[in-house]
A protein has these predicted regions:
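A structural feature that tracks compact, well-ordered secondary-structure segments
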Residues: 29-34, 70, 87-88, 129, ...
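Exposed beta-sheet edge and beta->alpha loop/turn motif
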Residues: 101-131
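A short, structured loop/turn motif at beta-sheet edges
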Residues: 89-97, 129-136
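Short, structured motif recognition centered on aromatic/hydrophobic residues
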Residues: 23-27, 52, 75, 125-128, ...
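Short beta-strand edge/turn micro-motifs at domain boundaries
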Residues: 4, 121-151
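A short, hydrophobic/aromatic-rich structural module that often spans a beta strand
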Residues: 104, 141-164
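Short, low-complexity N-terminal intrinsically disordered segments enriched in polar/charged residues
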Residues: 2-48, 156-166
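A solvent-exposed, acidic/Ser-Thr-rich amphipathic alpha-helical stretch
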Residues: 21, 40-94, 101-103
Length: 166
């Protein structure tokens, strides 16, 4: 690289690799909990003040209650039979990442879109930081399709996706 190199990977610089198994247990339990459609007691896996950082259309939720009330409950109501399928997971100390898909029937209104009854697939990537057995940060990126070389986020791809699938 020409010139001075910007500092890289600051958040993972002091990762404690001895915490990898604990992180794995938290993430596996959380995904099972989401697939069991748990909402009220999902705090078993999330810090009370955790940050959920979604991409365009999803926004940012600060704290467990905001996540539950402004994302998890509306999403679950709109996709009542949804299941998360992580296709790959990576664990490194307090950090974990996954990519995969959610499969569901669009059974209720979501992001202003009336229920269509259609099956959908939402692709995602998640990155988590776990501290003291709880998720404190969750970065999320979702994409249902690619059009004209540009990723389409949940806010723009979901309406198109709901109109295409049968």
């Amino acid at each position: 690289m020409k010139g001075s190199r910007p500092e890289q990977a600051v958040l993972t610089r002091d990762t404690d690799m001895s915490k990898t198994d604990d992180t794995r247990a938290v993430i596996e339990g959380m995904v099972d909990g989401l697939n069991d459609h748990r909402i009220g007691d999902i705090g078993e896996f999330f810090s009370e003040n955790f940050r959920w950082m979604g991409n365009q259309g999803c926004g940012q939720k600060i704290g467990l209650r905001e996540f539950q009330d402004n994302w998890q409950r509306p999403f679950q109501a709109a996709f009542s039979d949804k299941v998360c399928i992580d296709e790959a997971r990576l664990y490194m100390g307090e950090w974990a990442a996954a990519f995969g898909r959610q499969e569901a029937t669009h059974s209720g209104e979501f992001l202003g879109i009336k229920a269509t009854g259609k099956r959908i697939e939402i692709r995602y990537m998640d990155f988590w930081k776990v501290v003291d057995g709880k998720i404190v940060d969750n970065w999320v990126w979702t994409c249902s399709t690619v059009k004209a070389g540009k990723p389409m986020t949940a806010a723009t791809a979901l309406p198109q996706h709901l109109n295409k699938r049968g």
